[in-house]
């Protein structure tokens, strides 16, 4: 994973931006129209997905039209004054926001203020030329984004998912160390947990990108199954990270475990860490035995707490019960992850035997 990041200096989106700019300039030169506005539009129209390029392109065109119209109107009445720039920018922003052309506001405003100093006369002609250049930039960028190196995020999503499994296990290991020492978790562990959440959100965003362009590309059944697998894995990993976050907030220092209880918990969490590092492909019988022991321990803690008088203890759960509940909840997620992986493998084998 790290090797891929090391050598992937120029991404597909950067290459496509360069190609879009190059082709836009060629088209503008062929039709003998100014290039600068077309190039600006082409650069900002390259989006993470082809769908976004089309949708935002349809927003940016009317937005740029509004910006050009305001620029020419204020220049005609006020000339090349500071007030012309200010009014053109302000009116463009307000109009775009009122018409909900949010994706085109920046390009429209840049177009408006950039047109003023280079237009001395023939305002209506200049306005029409801006429409032509804006259209050129949008069309070229959309075509490039659609046909040249079309966005595919499946491999990236799979890589992020694998990384999430490993880093989730690492954070659990750090938390276990704090638990065994009976100390508050370190700031480093909290930081790693927040980074884990960021990585999860990044992976989910890539899934959304892939879904947007799914209808535009052909996929084999195996690719579709693989994509559905990582989607489900991410959903369950999100829940696991939520439970780990709860563990990180649990008051470890107030826990009072017996030596046997502590040992069972330690072995169970070690088993969970091992399962996560193997991407939940297998759960052995020893792990289930540990979970049974932990489950008994949880209900014993809960029943003991029920006998406490209100003036002795006013919470529904003790620190020990909270930790046991979260660990057992994580185990439930691991079982689900194992089941969906087994289903994925069996479907692949069935598909291979049919062919």
Curated annotation (Swiss-Prot):
Domain of life, per lineage: Bacteria
InterPro entries tied to this protein: ArAE_1 (IPR010343)
Pfam families attached to this UniProt entry: ArAE_1
Places the protein is found: Cell membrane
Bilayer topology term: Multi-pass membrane protein
Entry GO terms, CC: plasma membrane
Transmembrane regions listed in the UniProt entry: 19-39, 74-94, 109-129, 131-151
Keywords, sorted A to Z: Cell membrane, Membrane, Transmembrane, Transmembrane helix
Similarity comment: family membership: Belongs to the UPF0421 family.
Designated name of the protein: UPF0421 protein BALH_2468
Organism: Bacillus thuringiensis (strain Al Hakam)
